[in-house]
Amino acid sequence: LAVDLSPYLTEKEKSAYIAGFLEEGDLMNNGELKVFPIAKSTELLYLNVTDFVPFAEATGVTYADLSTVEGLNEAAHKYYDWTDAQTAAPNDGKALYGRDALTNYLLCGAQELGTTIFDAENGVMTLRFDKPTLRKLWDNYYVPYIKGWCSASGKFRSDDIKIGSLLAYVGSSSSASFFPTQVLTSDTESHGIEMAALPCPSFAGCEPVAVQQGAGMVVIPGTEDEISACVAFLKWFTQPENNLQFSVQSGYMP
């Protein structure tokens, strides 16, 4: 069981927090705050700028091309062909990017395309599988993977960046600290790289939808003094001066 923390915060105190973060802690949609938000993240497109520049200069691909799902896949197609042409061996092009979370792509992508895949209300879940929406999601995810424009081999896509398998990946904003500073091209050779963090690509012509994910803290039942002390700590921890320091060091959103 978790304590309802809502009575321990004034309306003024609640207004200082992002409304969506507090709403996520209202597990039963009844106004109770059972999970106190402390660590929230979204998704970004991370790019190995150092190795992207030669490709961009040769093909004319720009950061703007990477702002949409379709543009990113077209750039990935060009990157595959560009790397394939650098050797005599056929069909040995490289993948440009990968994704850490398929679920986020499906949920946010469907929402951008006008379909809410599922809703949950009063303990009942409603599923919606709109065929045109799912077809577009398929064409812009699985098809590029099959063609070799996108890839996933390590546990996380930042692992693939480190060994040079990818130049970019879509992942959590909290993964910024894991982006490698060098690429290992062999057991004995490596070179330094610089990172760029770009907005997560959205479907062309659609209102962008960004995932909000993360963790919170709960307070278990205890004495009134114990509960009040826990709430005092959570308020202190999420004060701007403390929260900003935590956000900078962890990659989570303020």
Where are these regions (language model features)?
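Extracytoplasmic/periplasmic solute-binding protein
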Residues: 26-43, 70-126
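A ligand-binding cleft/hinge motif common to bilobed small-molecule-binding domains
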Residues: 173-190
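Short, solvent-exposed loop/beta-turn-alpha elements that line the ligand-binding surface or hinge
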Residues: 6-17, 61-67, 90, 96, ...
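Paired acidic/hydrophobic, glycine-rich loop segments that form the ligand-binding mouth/hinge
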Residues: 167-172
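Glycine-centered hinge/linker elements that transmit conformational signals in sensory
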Residues: 73-80, 121-154, 200
